[in-house]
Amino acid sequence: MRYFIIFISLIISSFFILSLTNKLAAEEEWTIDKFRTLSFARVSGEQTHGDNLNFWITARDNCEKIYNTFTVYTYERPGDFKQLLNKNIPIKLNGVDITASVQDIAPFLMGYRVHLSLGSYPIKEYVYFLKEFYDEFQKYEIEIVDGIDFKAAKYFDITTNNWKLDKLVPSVLEASKLCKTINHLDS
């Protein structure tokens, strides 16, 4: 009987730990910080946690413009990877066809980390647009897709990721406030 109680206790404890781990993994964690003349808000991907969705704000732009970028990690290592630098590649954002500009490709761990840009925009208008966009779809999903003379699978082993943006507005507002302290200190 004693072993049975210990066995049941272990099973219940295991389920509790697993449910707690799943709850923690599902949390939307934002990093808000500053570096030199810029501040940023960043959230990790749900499919690939190391893929980040970034919102950069620079003091150089009087903290009024936001640069929206994302990173993708891939194990693929084609010999012509660097030819994608400064090129636009096709993506789908919640199913909508757009492009992203490849800003950087750097060796990372056993593959490459690719940094892509979605552009720069006035902060307030863009962040509220994104919030409405996210609220409408209840997701923010980017899929790298095939295009003219471009096969996504050649360069990316995982072509889709999504991010939670429930805390987008307060996170970017905090990053914007940080940017203004940089601007104030530099003037």
Please report, for each region that a protein language model flagged, where it lies by residue.
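A generic "folded-domain core" signal
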Residues: 23-187
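Classical Sec-dependent N-terminal signal peptides that target proteins to the secretory pathway
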Residues: 1-26
